């Protein structure tokens, strides 16, 4: 199955060289990463020794952070240039991360996944709003996760607030993101996400919002999910 938006892939390919520049195109991810890493580590009772699949890993910011805490990480993405950057950066930091240029659907097809080969944790951060068929990714995650394994999905709610803050604010006013990074029509309401997850027998353990203060440059988590949000889902 081809669950790829080539324009989205090309968009991120053009920014590949700036993945590890904390002041570059991916500055928001660098600012957000400590918060989401701590959140994932807390909800999983520690990442050490656990098998993790990072879908849409890009240049490897989250993948490296999880590997640094002792996780056994596989990162997949369709942007070849970003993966080249990810491999080089991991090697320079002496981290053993398996990076592959493949969709999660094809990853599932090409690997004979036994129960022992399945993952304890899957992360899918800021990916669903960039693909044609988000539900397809969730279906694949179902078959790649161990029983009781955890799936972390972060995406953006399709609300007026999200449009103003993410597209107008972050892309045009603050210029934290390149213009055109997001398409409002691809934003996903929590009700839509949870319906897809329910159809695959995932149980939602928690859903929270995360927010950015442009003055302090800090992110924080609360219960407001009208903009960016992250869901923790357990495979049942």
From Swiss-Prot:
Record keywords, A-Z: Methyltransferase, S-adenosyl-L-methionine, Transferase, Ubiquinone biosynthesis
Pfam families listed in its UniProt record: Methyltransf_23
The keyword Ribonucleoprotein appears for this protein: no
Gene3D superfamilies on file: Vaccinia Virus protein VP39 (3.40.50.150)
EC code: 2.1.1.222, 2.1.1.64
InterPro entries with a match to the protein in the record: SAM-dependent_MTases_sf (IPR029063), UbiG_MeTrfase (IPR010233)
A GO molecular function held by the record: polyprenyldihydroxybenzoate methyltransferase activity
Residues that coordinate or bind S-adenosyl-L-methionine: 36, 56, 77, 125
Pathway annotation: Cofactor biosynthesis; ubiquinone biosynthesis
Substrates-to-products reaction catalysed: a 3-demethylubiquinol + S-adenosyl-L-methionine = a ubiquinol + S-adenosyl-L-homocysteine + H(+); a 3-(all-trans-polyprenyl)benzene-1,2-diol + S-adenosyl-L-methionine = a 2-methoxy-6-(all-trans-polyprenyl)phenol + S-adenosyl-L-homocysteine + H(+)
Gene Ontology biological process terms in this record: methylation
Function: O-methyltransferase that catalyzes the 2 O-methylation steps in the ubiquinone biosynthetic pathway.
Listed NCBIfam families: UbiG
Similarity annotation: Belongs to the methyltransferase superfamily. UbiG/COQ3 family.
Name of the protein in question: Ubiquinone biosynthesis O-methyltransferase
Organism this protein belongs to: Glaesserella parasuis serovar 5 (strain SH0165) (Haemophilus parasuis)
Name of the coding gene: ubiG
């Amino acid at each position: 199955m081809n669950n790829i938006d080539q324009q989205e892939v090309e968009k991120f390919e053009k920014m590949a060289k700036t993945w590890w520049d904390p002041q570059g195109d991916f500055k928001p991810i660098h600012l957000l990463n400590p918060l989401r890493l701590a959140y994932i580590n807390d909800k999983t009772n520690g990442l050490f020794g656990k098998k993790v699949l990072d879908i849409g890993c890009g240049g490897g910011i989250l993948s490296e952070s999880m590997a640094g805490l002792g996780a056994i990480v596989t990162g997949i993405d369709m942007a070849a240039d970003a993966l080249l950057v990810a491999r080089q950066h991991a090697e320079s930091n002496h981290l053993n991360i398996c990076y592959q240029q493949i969709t999660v659907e094809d990853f599932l097809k090409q690997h004979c996944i036994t129960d022992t080969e399945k993952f304890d944790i899957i992360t899918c951060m800021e990916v669903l709003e960039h693909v044609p068929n988000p539900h397809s990714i969730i279906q694949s995650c179902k078959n790649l996760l161990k029983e009781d394994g955890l799936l972390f999905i972060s995406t953006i709610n399709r609300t007026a607030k999200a449009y103003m803050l993410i597209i107008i604010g972050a892309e045009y006013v603050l210029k934290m993101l390149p213009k055109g990074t997001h398409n409002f029509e691809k934003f996903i309401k929590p009700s839509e996400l949870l319906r897809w997850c329910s159809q695959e027998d995932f149980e939602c353990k928690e859903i929270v919002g995360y927010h950015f203060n442009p003055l302090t440059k800090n992110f924080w988590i609360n219960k407001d999910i009208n903009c960016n949000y992250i869901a923790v889902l357990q495979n049942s």
